């Protein structure tokens, strides 16, 4: 893998341009991080990491937790050893990871789609405003996206070179554990790349290697089967906040002071079931609204909708990538002769991932921009049929290398 990257650096002018752009952006972002400085935004993952660093275990304020899967808090635990400055150190590491993600998206795209589209895809990824900023946030998306891209590159590279498939399998399952909503999508991609009969045992064993230790820990700690993370009823509850009674809200806020997240699931469940049974039409309507939030802008940011930051980071990317996705779907349906069967199946899987993730958030909650960012880069890859479908762009796109 390293030699493959170095070989392309030596031989490909386009790859070097992306690399130098990445180095420039990395330098600017690190100067801003440590020079201005930009204060990193941290949520629960960081506080779990602090407890790990302090030797008190995988905990939050109310004791043991399964609110977050272990990959990202463990990633943060080493920076957490150096106190609050560790936030800056962790952000610096994340900026390096996103620099390498830009290189890997070029490499994977060049294998699958050709080097010229790879140049465009990696350029759009590197300059995507939300992705430029997001490594300043200590939240699992900052690790999920680089891991997902690394998995894709390793899967493409191992298929091209007929290499050992276990490492990309492990990275794929690790990505799914980092962001469990991606598990069905990762499974679909694992089967796409490694679905032959001879790989079935390896797929199962590598999944067990990644998920079993965490599942055993949760069984021993909570006496419950939790292979990923605890919040299920909580996510439904958060999406129903506008409809629950004030008494129910007060009860939940009180319970949160002394219950851990696994215990709280029992408190959320009857509230959610009551909403389903008494206000199902309202729930359906709000689910449709959350779907539009996912694909446009969450309600909590509506009062900032026309500020330059939101226009540049969300409105324009969502609009342009949304139009691109619509056109690409039309081309996949109507211009199948421009795509190989393998590429067609790959792109359909990506569309399926986008649809699945948007439906899950629509059914639960879609209050944060970051929910979309785990998968928004897939829309960049889905621009390929546009390049392939129009004669001039197809000529620019070039051939596979």
Place the predicted regions along the sequence by residue:
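Transmembrane-helix signature of polytopic, membrane-embedded enzymes
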Residues: 15, 89, 103-127, 145-146, ...
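Transmembrane-helix motifs of polytopic, lipid-linked glycan transferases
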Residues: 92-112, 150, 326-333
């Amino acid at each position: 893998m390293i030699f493959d990257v170095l070989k392309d650096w030596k031989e490909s002018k386009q790859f070097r341009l992306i690399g130098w752009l990445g180095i420039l952006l990395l330098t600017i972002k690190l100067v801003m991080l440590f020079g201005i400085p930009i204060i990193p935004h941290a949520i629960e993952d960081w506080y779990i990491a602090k407890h790990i660093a302090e030797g008190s275990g995988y905990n939050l304020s109310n004791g043991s937790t399964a609110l977050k899967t272990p990959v990202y808090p463990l990633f943060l635990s080493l920076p957490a050893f150096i106190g609050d400055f560790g936030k800056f150190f962790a952000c610096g590491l994340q900026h390096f990871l996103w620099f390498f993600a830009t290189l890997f998206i070029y490499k994977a795209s060049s294998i699958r789609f050709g080097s010229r589209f790879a140049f465009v895809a990696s350029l759009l990824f590197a300059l995507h405003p939300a992705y430029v900023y997001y490594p300043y946030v200590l939240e699992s998306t900052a690790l999920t996206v680089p891991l997902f891209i690394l998995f894709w590159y390793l899967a493409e590279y191992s298929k091209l070179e007929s290499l050992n498939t276990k490492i990309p399998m492990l990275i794929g399952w690790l990505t799914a554990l980092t962001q469990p909503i991606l598990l069905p999508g990762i499974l679909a991609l694992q089967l796409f790349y490694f679905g032959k009969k001879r790989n079935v045992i390896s797929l199962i064993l590598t999944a067990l290697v990644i998920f079993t230790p965490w599942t055993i820990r949760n069984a021993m700690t909570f006496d419950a089967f939790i292979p990923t993370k605890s919040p299920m009823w909580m996510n439904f509850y958060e999406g129903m906040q506008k409809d629950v009674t004030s008494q129910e809200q007060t009860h939940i806020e009180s319970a949160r002071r002394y219950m851990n997240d696994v215990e709280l699931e029992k408190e959320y469940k009857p509230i959610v079931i009551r909403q389903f049974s008494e206000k199902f039409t309202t729930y359906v309507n709000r689910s449709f609204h959350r779907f539009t939030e996912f694909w446009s802008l969450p309600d909590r940011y509506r009062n900032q909708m026309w500020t330059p930051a939101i226009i540049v980071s969300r409105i324009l990317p969502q609009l342009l990538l949304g139009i691109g996705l619509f056109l690409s779907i039309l081309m996949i349906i109507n211009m199948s002769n421009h795509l190989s069967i393998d590429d067609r199946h790959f792109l359909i899987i990506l569309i399926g991932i986008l649809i699945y993730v948007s439906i899950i958030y629509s059914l639960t909650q879609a209050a944060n921009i970051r929910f979309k960012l785990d998968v928004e880069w897939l829309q960049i890859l889905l621009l390929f049929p546009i390049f392939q479908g129009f004669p001039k762009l197809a000529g620019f796109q070039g051939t596979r290398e």
